[in-house]
Amino acid sequence: AAPHGTGHVKAGLNYAMSLHAIMDAHRQGYDENMYLDSATRTKVEETGGANFIFVTKDNTVVTPKSNSILPSITRRSLIYVAEHYLGLKVEEREVYLDEVKDFAECGLCGTAAVISPVGKIVDHGKEICFPSGMEEMGPTTKKLYETLTGIQMGRIEAPEGWIKVIE
């Protein structure tokens, strides 16, 4: 997404523009693309269909902040769960590609999957591997997932205003 662009809007054209890139990634054996900021190409933004969520070694939840990425409801919900249900520190800030190697956990969040674990990021042949691996979520990511899906399924009490009865 570009400054003053439409990356912050959930629009069909935004998804269409990423189709060539994702098809190319799949041909090369990758599941997804990591999009960086267009100005410096040093800051993590999002993938074609999900937002990033990182966890530091001291259990701080970090999400990239940019005016050019989609303000995901799932990401916002996970931030709320992290702070108010799990008592975790949360940082919404610029995340530099150079610091990604230092995170303990990485996931992609969105409506359908809630959170999917990321085990490895490949940057021009350089591999960044996360301790939790690709098959399982890390412990903090798993707690976030279980708490948010528990709220969605009615097993955990929802915050005020999150659920509306439709008759």
Regions found by a protein language model. Give the residues of each.
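Conserved catalytic-core subdomain
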Residues: 36-167
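Short, conserved active-site entrance elements at the starts or edges of catalytic domains
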Residues: 1-46
